[in-house]
Amino acid sequence: MALWRIDEEETPLASLCTVAEQQEAAAFAAPRRRLEYLAWHALLHALLPEAHAAHDPEGGPVLVFPSSGQNTPANIPGGLPHRQNCIRPDTGLHKNARSENIPFQHTRFGDPLQTGEFAPLRHIGVSHAHGYAAVILSAQPCAVDIEPADSDFSRAARRFISPQEQALQPCALPEALFPALVWCAKEAVYKWVRISGLSLLHDIRITEIHPETTRTNPSGTGFPALEAFHRLTVTAAGKTLQLHGFTVEGICCVYGIG
């Protein structure tokens, strides 16, 4: 999982994306939406240069691997450039740490098949909000959601937080942060299970929230220490899922793999 603070202007970001992605970004009227769209695609290319993103029938992102490597930006280095504005909190790697090369073979049907240590990274989760973009890649279904930690949920909270869930709020967690943590967790699960029409209040239920050890980022990332690490247990669509949440620079982030 990687989180990107969007410091770049639109033109430098566009240079890290394919022509098709640049055209798709241009369809957004709002400059912020164009930046966020370009940023998460650039981050995907930095993490996994061989991959592009498409969408399934439900609109969720999926990884695709053009076998000929066509339409790949020539200046993508296969690593994480601009090291001051990206961090991978699950590994401690930051933006000047280069991604490992991922070898490919092909199936008898001609489809690209990843091999080696990171095989097969078939799943992707994406989120972007207020000048940040996040991408998670995994061999298993995965999802991520980010939101400003100080978002005002005073009117909406009752539509996605049950009294039982409210009672789970850890004493050490600031009261104003709790709704953002729950919102991100439920949004991540909604994207994870990919079943349209689920109710955040009734169908996606948080059953446990436990503090985790706060982690310190390596020097040179440009990010302060990650805060408010929590592990959440969530039930949805007959499944029990484990998620991890943290805050950094006023952004709440929750992600899960499994």
Can you describe what each PLM-predicted range is?
Residues M1-G258:
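Core catalytic alpha/beta fold that binds nucleotide/phospho-ligands
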